[in-house]
Structures are given as structure tokens and as C-alpha cells.
Amino acid sequence: MDEQAGPGVFFSNNHPGAGGAKGLGPLAEAAAAGDGAAAAGAARAQYSLPGILHFLQHEWARFEVERAQWEVERAELQAQIAFLQGERKGQENLKKDLVRRIKMLEYALKQERAKYHKLKYGTELNQGDMKPPSYDSDEGNETEVQPQQNSQLMWKQGRQLLRQYLQEVGYTDTILDVKSKRVRALLGFSSDVTDREDDKNQDSVINGTEAEVKETAMIGKSELTDSASVLDNFKFLESAAADVSDEDEDEDTDGRAKSVIDTSTIVRKKALPDTSEDRDTKEALKEFDFLVTSEEGDNESRSAGDGTDWEKEDQCLTPEAWNVDQGVISKLKEQYKKERKGKKGVKRPNRSKLQDMLANLRDVDELPSLQPSVGSPSRPSSSRLPEQELSRADEVEALTFPPSSGKSFIMGADEALESELGLGELAGLTVANEADSLAYDIANNKDALRKTWNPKFTLRSHFDGIRALAFHPIEPVLITASEDHTLKMWNLQKTAPAKKSTSLDVEPIYTFRAHKGPVLCVVMSSNGEQCYSGGTDGRIQSWSTTNPNVDPYDAYDPSVLRGPLLGHTDAVWGLAYSAAHQRLLSCSADGTLRLWNTTEVAPALSVFNDNQELGIPASVDLVSSDPSHMVASFSKGYTSIFNMETQQRVLTLESNVDSTSSSSCQINRVISHPTLPISITAHEDRHIKFYDNNTGKLIHSMVAHLEAVTSLAVDPNGLYLMSGSHDCSIRLWNLESKTCIQEFTAHRKKFEESIHDVAFHPSKCYIASAGADALAKVFV
């Protein structure tokens, strides 16, 4: 029997009680055999060869995916590390550069302090050891430059390793070259040395005069430039400041190459001039250039258009080809310097010699045709001139004029000879027109001696726009009126140094507080003991001015406020003080002009324009030529003169009033000339107009600014007019010629407004401006 038939078969043959099972027989045997085969088949199917292969392939694919993800993450992290390293290196370079700048500025500041102290006090300022700043980066660069005696193989290996590092970081050689050239261009360095050497190589190959000395010099130069290029790239990464040391190294190598070739020849010195040579030496060398041209004319022919080939050719020749005696050259140099010193002291010829010279120059046909001297390359412009002009120049040299290389000897400037030899108006000069030129010179001298105003003080204590200002008639004191409801008094002699500039700041010595709204105008009495202000509250406040030397922190003095002048029902726009009658004029938005007695706080003495037939007054002033008259401008564009004693309107000045447009004809300010019967008005349409007070006719009109003209002031002598505008500019005008002689920007815009008022000091050299930017500025 087969042993592998199963356990059922084995037990049925040997067990003594198996006879009861024999009745089932073949069915039981078949069932038992089927169960055993199924269990064995299931065990074998779990570890089949295809399943194992499939499992291995699946696991390998999963491993490859995870490995790819790991590689991507590794590459990203490496890129991030490289980026951060580059960023760190850039920050370090920036820090080094900033430290160098700080040290440089500190050193410059110490020098300026010492210079200022020496100029002011005449003694040296003791600041300790004033040594030029030493930079750590420079010391590091010097230590890096020292090991230059390495072999060529070491340089190549270092260069290759550096290129590999740069490629990993993300830089390439091209980017480095571009950045290096850009930095050099910004710093003002140039690579003239390499260009010069390339030109020398080309010329030497063309001329066929290559020398062994030149070859050895160029071999040494190539080795040095090979190493210098590596240092250039490395130092560019280290710091931007190392370019200076690289340039110094290039200059040193250039000096070594220059020392290999004989430096005793004139041509070599001409090709690579030494910076220590002075101007006289260079000009002396130019005088001997004819030696070079004559020598070349015997040996070979040169093209007429090329004037520099002779320099390049002779650089490769040996010094024995010239046989130049250096002693003779030095003697000629000294002689030339003495001649130049003698020519510097030559005086101009007198008038008779000039007239004779002019007469000779006008007779072109009678001049003899002299042969020009030997042409030298040092005078390229002389070859372009005709022979007649050269002959004239030679004649002029006999009149002790210095030679001018083909340019006009009378003009003495850079213009070339024009028609009539560039004489222009000098050719027609006669005795008759001397008076005209004298008057012209006098006018020019007046303009040259004219004072130029410069900003001196900035007054910064107000919190809102400054509407008006007034100077004390005698003292350097200024009062400003602001939209912050206050007036402030400033002593221009009590200054304090400003925080951020060299200018001086002034602090207010007193603040006037009584108005219940913005203060629009202010005026001072003739003796400076009282001042008056008007505001939007319709009140005119009368003040007693304090002592200019008062302590700003003194106790409050109630006697400063004298009391209000009541009568106006709307904002007071303008004030004017009459010193002759001690009267005060005011104009208000209620349409009236009022005359007040300043000696007492009382109602107005008289009221003008009560029916508002001319409109609402905007500005008022006293007529200086007639103290009993006043002039006022109105919103409808009219300007009228009133008699204060009779309260009658005397004259209405000529005006082109457009009834359809109110803004175009608006007059912002009217003032009277201090000595002449002239009224001047400032208009919203950018014009300034001048009127005759006797006839009312318009004398002159001009567009004075880019935007509306807001304020006017005339100096006490009546020579100059100052105007302010919303275009942020102040302009100073000559009243005689009606021309602008100075313009300066004083304030910034705020709500499309800029300058509200300008003023001259009555007795001192001050002018002031008030702006919408809450600043008042004083000019001297």
C-alpha cells in the first residue's frame, strides 16, 4: 500500500475496531482524501513563484518612489542651504561695506571738526590720534594676496574648485564677469592695461619687430594676470571694497612690466605717461614730437589720417635705435619752463597796438603768405586751418601773445576763428559807442553787487497754517498770526542750534491768546509798542508788545491784552496802521471798511462801503504819497482810493472786470508804493498789476507766478517788490525793470495753499514768509 494515501487508509488497515466503518467504504475514503489535498494546495498557493516575483516588483517600485521623493527633498534642501549661504555672504559683505563707510565718515567728520575749529579759533583741536581708518577686510585681502608664489597647477585646481562651488551656489563665470565690470564701472575703474597690451601685441606682429624682451615681459604678465583673475573673482565674492586693492595690484604689475622695457626713451614715456609728470613736462615733450615724425619720414611712409601709429610702433623698438641724449633733453625742458614762466607775465598791449593789429587783420589781401612751420602731432587742430590763418597766427606771436594752437588769440576762449577772425562786435569798435558800453557795464555791476537772500531761520511753533506776519519797526522781532487761534512773538537774536541741520531755530518768547478762531491779519504800530490782530471771530484785538528779552517762562501779564475793537460782524481780513494819524484801518467780510482810533478802545470813527456797492473788501493799505488816502481792493475786481477825512471815494482804478466770472478778477492783496504814487495789486489769475494813483490808469501788468499771487511787499526804499504765491515760490522783482532777480522755494503745499504772507523788515536786513505748512521762514 502507498504510504502517501493518507492517515485514513493507514488506520483502517491496522485498527482493530475499524470494522464498523467499513460499511461506508469508498465515500469516507474519498472525503478524507479531498480535505487533505485542499489544505496542502492552499499552503502551496500562498508562496507561489509568480506571487513572490510580483511582491518583489511591488516593493522595488515603492522603494524607488520613496527614493525619488527623498532625492527631491535633498535637492530642495541643498538649494535652500546654498541660497541661505549666499544670502549670508551678501549680508556679510554689506555689513563690511557699511562698516567701512562708517569709519570713513567718522574720519572725515573728525577732519572737518579739526578744520572748522582751526578756522574759527586758530588753534588745533585735540582729538587724540587721528589715524586713517584701517579695515579688517583690507588686512584679510593683503594676507590673501601674499601666497602668490604657488605653482600654475595649484592655481588651476583652485580655479576649478571655485568654479564648481559657484555652479552649486548658482553663479556662473559670465554673471561674475558682468557684475565685476559693473562694479568697476560704478567705482570709476577701467581696464586700460589689458587693452593697451593687446594693442601693442597687434602692432608688434604687424610691424614684424617682436623682441625677446617683450616676449618675456608678456609671459610674466600672463602668469600674473592668470592669478590676478582668480583673486578678482574671489575678492568680488568676499567684499565689494576689495576691487580697490585689485586695481592697485594691476597697477603694480603694470609698473613691473613697464620696468622690463627701457623707460629712458621719450616715446615710451609718451605711451605710458607717469602721473608724477607735471603739465609743463608734458607740453615740453610735445615740442620734440617733430623728431619722431622726421625719423619716420626717412624710413617709411605713414598714412595721413592716422596720427598715433608712430607711438605704437616705436614702443617695441630698442632704445639704441634713437640715440637720444638725456642731458640735452633735460636742458631743453628747463629752458622751456623758463620761457613759459616768462610768458605768463606778459601784459596786454595798449589801445593803439590793438587798433593797429585790427587794421592789419582786416586787410586780408595785403598779408604776405608765410610758410607754416613744421607740423607736429601735438597740434592736431592746426592742420585743419587754412594757410592764411596760420600765417596770421605767426604774425600775432610777434606781438608777445602766447601761441594758441590755431584758436582765436583775441577771444582767448575755445571758439575757433569765425568771420572777421572771431572779433564780432570788436571789429566795429569806435570811440562813439564807448558811452553805451559804459552804461551797460554799470548796469551789469549793479546786478553783480545785488544782494542774494538766503534762508536763515525756520519758526516751527505753530500748530496750523500761518496767515500773516509783521516785523517790529526797529528790533529784530517778528510777530506771526496763525489759524491755531494764537499769535507768537519771536526774537530773531535768541537762537538755538537746530537738531538736524546747520541752520538755527528760534523759539517764541511770547504767545498772544484771546481770539476765538483763526487769526487772519496782524499789524504793528510805528513805535512797536502795540500790535493789532484780526480774526474770523470779527474782533480786532489790541495788544501791548512785551520786552524782546522777556523770559518765555515768566508769569502771565494781564496788561498785555488791551482789549478788543468791536464793530465788525464777520471775519477781519486786513489791517493797516497810519503812523501820521495813529489810526487803524480794517476791512472785513461784512463788506465794510472801518477807521479806528488806536489810542483808546472805542467804536469805529468812520465806516466805508456800507452799502457794499463795490463788493466785499479783501485788502486795504495806506497811500504812502498821501497819508489822508487809503486804497482798498474788493471781491468784484475793483480797486478804489478813499479819502479818510471826507469819507468819500476819490478814484476807482482801471480794471477789466468780467461780470460772469468772479474768481478770475479776484484781487488778493493791494499795497501802496512807499515813495511813488503807485498801487500794486496781486490777482488770483497769476498777475501783478501796477496803477497810477493820480490817473487810475494801468501802468504795467505781468504774469508773475504759476498759480494765484497771494501776497506782496515792497522794501522800505521802494526798489524791490516781493511776491508770494500758492505755487510755493517767493519771487523778488526789480521795480525799475519789472524783472525777476531771485526766486526761491520756501514752503510746501497744504490743501492747495502754500504762501499766505511776505514782509520786509522796515530797518534791518530781514525778509519773512508765512506758509500754510505752519512754518514761518526768515531770510537774510
Curated annotation (Swiss-Prot):
Keywords: Calmodulin-binding, Cell projection, Coiled coil, Cytoplasm, Membrane, Phosphoprotein, Repeat, Synapse, WD repeat
Keyword Cytoplasm recorded: yes
Keyword Ribosomal protein carried by entry: no
Tissue localization of expression: Mainly expressed in brain but is also expressed at low levels in various tissues such as kidney, spleen, skeletal muscle and lung.
Biological process annotations from GO: negative regulation of cell population proliferation; Wnt signaling pathway
Spans of repeat WD: 461-500, 514-553, 567-606, 662-701, 704-743, 750-780
Cross-referenced Pfam families: Striatin (PF08232), WD40 (PF00400)
Entry's localization field: Cytoplasm; Membrane; Cell projection, Dendritic spine
Residue span of region Caveolin-binding: 55-63
Basic residues: compositionally biased ranges: 338-351
Main location, first listed in the record: cytoplasm
Record-linked SUPFAM superfamilies: WD40 repeat-like
Membrane topology: Peripheral membrane protein
Subunit organization: Part of the core of STRIPAK complexes composed of PP2A catalytic and scaffolding subunits, the striatins (PP2A regulatory subunits), the striatin-associated proteins MOB4, STRIP1 and STRIP2, PDCD10 and members of the STE20 kinases, such as STK24 and STK26. Interacts with CTTNBP2; this interaction may regulate dendritic spine distribution of STRN. Activation of glutamate receptors weakens the interaction with CTTNBP2.
Role summary: Calmodulin-binding scaffolding protein which is the center of the striatin-interacting phosphatase and kinase (STRIPAK) complexes. STRIPAK complexes have critical roles in protein (de)phosphorylation and are regulators of multiple signaling pathways including Hippo, MAPK, nuclear receptor and cytoskeleton remodeling. Different types of STRIPAK complexes are involved in a variety of biological processes such as cell growth, differentiation, apoptosis, metabolism and immune regulation.
Protein name: Striatin
Organism: Mus musculus (Mouse)
Origin organism lineage: Eukaryota, Metazoa, Chordata, Craniata, Vertebrata
Gene this protein is translated from: Strn
